[in-house]
Amino acid sequence: MRELIKNIRKAVGSIGSFINVVYNKLHFIYYKVMIGKSLKVNGRIKISGTKGKIVIGNNVVINSSEYAIPIGYTCKTIFWILGDGKIIIGDNTGMSNVALCSQSSISIGNGVLLGGGVKIYDTDFHSINYIERRNINTDKGRKSKPIIIEDDAFIGAGSMILKGSIIGARSIIGANSVVSGTVPADEIWAGNPAKFIRKIE
């Protein structure tokens, strides 16, 4: 009986994987996503925004399923473009159930790892002026600044990277941290707000 159940689960999983591949390919075509070689996607990616640009490099792995990363982050990977925003993802990068929202630009280098549930927003979404916020249907006063994550950086699970942030090459951001500013290369930062912990030797 256990073997029968195992075989049924395997067959259902294969069908589901095929459907996900078709779904993602249609999404990429519709949203004109530029894709490099050997992209691997586990689950379905959600994309929003018909303007702007999304570029995915070579040998990128994207997990977008509760089954792909069983550590408590069950949302799908989301690429959300506001206006002419840009999301650029370098080669040999991996991410799991992340949310990237760009009004300006999000640039992710080569060899970067984004842990489960990481959120990267280059926009405030709403104005800090309460008068402008009274009309929830307007984006008036919404501010945005580019985000840069340099090569080989590692962003720990549950972290949030806010507008204007720069994460230096090879630096590590501890889990559940909030970054709003510049993290130099070869350093470990953690906390809310994220603070310097130590250099990486």
What are the language-model segments listed below?
Residues 123-130, 167-170, 184-186:
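Short conserved catalytic/interaction loops centered on acidic-Pro-aromatic/His motifs
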Residues 109-141:
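Histidine/lysine/aspartate-rich catalytic loop segments that bind and position anionic ligands
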Residues 178, 188, 196:
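Conserved beta-strand positions that form and line the central face of beta-propeller blades
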Residues 156, 162, 174, 179-180:
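Short hydrophobic beta-strand segments in globular cytosolic domains
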Residues 1-121, 150-152, 159-161, 169, ...:
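Domain-scale signature associated with acetyltransferase and cell-envelope carbohydrate enzymes
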Residues 146-147, 164-165, 180, 186:
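A short, glycine- and basic residue-enriched loop/turn
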Residues 78-83, 135-147:
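A short acidic, glycine-rich active-site loop
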